[in-house]
Amino acid sequence: MNDFGIKNMDQVAPVANSFRGTLKRQPAFDTFDGSLFAVLPSLSEDQTLQEVPTGLDSVSHDSASCELPLLTPCSKAVMSQALKATFSGFQKEQRRLGIPKNPWLWSEQQVCQWLLWATNEFSLVNVNLHQFGMNGQMLCNLGKERFLELAPDFVGDILWEHLEQMIKENQEKTEDQYEENSHLNAVPHWINSNTLGFSMEQAPYGMQAPNYPKDNLLDSMCPPSATPAALGSELQMLPKSRLNTVNVNYCSISQDFPSSNVNLLNNNSGKPKDHDSPENGGDSFESSDSLLRSWNSQSSLLDVQRVPSFESFEEDCSQSLCLSKLTMSFKDYIQERSDPVEQGKPVIPAAVLAGFTGSGPIQLWQFLLELLSDKSCQSFISWTGDGWEFKLADPDEVARRWGKRKNKPKMNYEKLSRGLRYYYDKNIIHKTSGKRYVYRFVCDLQNLLGFTPEELHAILGVQPDTED
């Protein structure tokens, strides 16, 4: 047995005897070419131990030998979250200095205040603020490449990331508000009287009505979500002749086709009041005709018994929307159309109701009436049997169907309930106190639909809700 504890070397390694020899120790480095380490700096060179490397000189020019891990989408997400947490400190500065959340609205001074905050936050040096002597709109229009040229080295990406995050957050907030407010853009004001705060004396047929305060008129007809910029861009699309005068015809139940020519817009009209920020919702209309239809449905200028017609806005108005039809109830309107209610179909189809009221796109309150008048939907929404009160037995299902109708896959009950809350101030729908998911129509549905609650309940087979 040798020193290595092996009894017979021949049994372990049957190697030819001619190759057997004494084992010798040899440094492992002797087998490598010394040129392998030629790239390493030598202490005998000019560089000394006291020198501090810059971090750039010692980087190898051979990118293939780089062992740094690549920036993966996961690591990017982590970095983005970390930066977002750091940037949250700027929100406090925004509140203190009154800087708008939307960077597009910043003044030149507010751009400078943002850069000063970043300079202090990240301990930046040699930041030339004069290079950013511009307002927020110009800043956002720079683009990333131009922005990085103006920004200090190594921090331009961080500043641009912050700017992009603020722009994205503002866009998401605007989209959410548009989604919540879209169903109110054309709420007919015959539901809520005295909306404009003044009444209009009836002028004889063919006479021009007196001029009214133009600022209040425009503010009332344009929803808060319609910014002056969006309004101006839409008005530019209209022919000049249509900008000067818009004819609005009204009908009264007690009179035959009285008409008023209301001078809504002219060259001397006052400018609508500026809103603080388009963060309130910068809604834009799809076309000039849709803008006029929205005004027509929102600015009846009269009381509950007056309904605006479409005749002045659309020459190709269908016969179903003529004045004689709008003077009747929805029930009579359906009978006049010879459209009997089919078995298993809603008694009040939302699309037909929207056409009858002239509201344009289907509104949330119209959609709820459709569900409430459909027997197949009583498992998740139904009348309680107490007047116009109704209950959402499955609010998530109601929200899902509303999202499907409006092509909003992300719709949920939280967003739906926010939409319902907008109707509170309009006196269209109120929440029933002390009852969960229970609401009540407080507008004059009986006059609109031509049904009493009891008649509609009988048609649908609704039994009074005995639950507390």
From Swiss-Prot:
Q: What InterPro entries does the annotation carry? A: Ets1_N_flank, Ets_dom, ETS_fam, Pointed_dom, SAM/pointed_sf, Transform_prot_C-ets, Transform_prot_C-ets-2, WH-like_DNA-bd_sf
What residues does the PNT domain cover?
85-170
**Region ranges (Disordered):** 262-290
Q: Where in the cell is it found?
A: Nucleus
Q: Does the keyword Phosphoprotein apply?
A: yes
PTM info: Phosphorylation by CDK10 at Ser-220 and Ser-225 creates a phosphodegron that targets ETS2 for proteasomal degradation.
The record's Gene Ontology biological-process terms are: ectodermal cell fate commitment; mesoderm development; positive regulation of transcription by RNA polymerase II; primitive streak formation
Query: Which residues, as ranges, make up the DNA-binding region of this protein?
Result: 362-442
Q: What SMART domains does the record tag this protein with? A: ETS (SM00413), SAM_PNT (SM00251)
CDD domains, sorted? SAM_PNT-ETS-2
Identify the domain of life.
Answer: Eukaryota
Example GO molecular function term?
A: nuclear glucocorticoid receptor binding
Sorted alphabetically, the Gene Ontology cellular component annotations on this record are:
cytosol; nucleoplasm; plasma membrane
Q: What family is reported?
A: Belongs to the ETS family.
Purpose of the protein = Transcription factor activating transcription. Binds specifically the GGA DNA motif in gene promoters and stimulates transcription of those genes.
Protein name per the record = Protein C-ets-2
Q: Per the UniProt entry, what species is this protein from, by scientific name?
A: Mus musculus (Mouse)
